[in-house]
From Swiss-Prot:
GO terms for cellular component: cytoplasm. It comes from the Bacteria. It is an enzyme of class 5 (isomerase). This is Probable phosphoglycerate mutase GpmB. The record marks 150 as: Transition state stabilizer. The active site is at residues 9, 82. Signal peptide: none annotated. It catalyses: (2R)-2-phosphoglycerate = (2R)-3-phosphoglycerate. Its EC number is 5.4.2.-. It comes from Shigella dysenteriae serotype 1 (strain Sd197). One of its GO terms (molecular function) is phosphatase activity. Substrate binds at residues 8-15, 21-22, 58, 60, 82-85, 104-105, 151-152.
């Protein structure tokens, strides 16, 4: 059985400011750095053998801290990037016009083919993050990889493993530096393939983590 751990990046300046990030970037806050150190301690205990990360700046900084603790090399994979949120990136969430807010709500309320102008659909996001997960099956026997990505991206990944459409209503809370685990297995009582073991664990963090749409 292959166990794959999923981690969302640490808190960023724009998370704290309620700005929409998408594939734009802002640095980790001091709290985000602390979260990364705490998840790094947990990752070392888990015996992580490979670290695979989105190549955006906030995930890069998070995995630098994790890799120091685990002694693992880092593989950067652009398929693990956050949803491209088009013309809304960098916007303060409270400054959106009614039209812009309607675009944003499409990503939350389960709109088939919902898309922010110049951005991605949830199906496009799902296709690439699931492909990145499938690549873990090519790792050597006994590997225990850690994938570091983003809130909407990881939420979409876990939800589609559960059998939901990529564009389904967003009802899974994955806070900064939360840990989820998915397993690839053959089972008598579960559908063969990927299954969700845990989602959104924050027991390793010593302070509340933000839960904002901007990722």
């Amino acid at each position: 059985m292959l166990q794959v751990y999923l981690v969302r990046h640490g808190e960023t300046q724009w998370n704290a400011e309620r700005r929409i990030q998408g594939q734009s970037d802002s640095p980790l806050t001091a709290k985000g750095e602390q979260q990364a150190m705490q998840v790094a301690t947990r990752a070392k205990e888990l015996g992580i053998t490979h670290i695979i990360s989105s190549d955006l700046g906030r995930t890069r900084r998070t995995v630098e801290i994790i890799a120091q603790a685990c002694g693992c090399d880092i593989i950067f994979d652009s398929r693990l990037r956050e949803l491209n949120m088009g013309v809304l990136e960098k916007s303060h969430i409270d400054s959106l016009t009614e039209e812009e807010e309607n675009w944003r709500r499409q990503l939350v309320n389960g709109t088939v083919d919902g898309r922010i102008p110049e951005g991605e659909s949830m199906q496009e996001l799902s296709d690439r993050v699931n492909a990145a997960l499938e690549s873990c099956r090519d790792l050597p026997q006994g590997s225990r990889p850690l994938l570091v990505s983003h809130g909407i991206a990881l939420g979409c990944l876990v939800s589609t493993i559960l059998g939901l459409p990529a564009w389904a209503e967003r009802r899974l809370r994955l806070r900064n530096c939360s840990i989820s685990r998915v397993d690839y297995q053959e089972s008598l009582w579960l559908s063969s393939g990927w299954v969700v073991e845990t989602a959104g664990d924050i027991s390793h963090l010593d302070a509340p983590a933000l839960d904002e749409l901007q990722r």
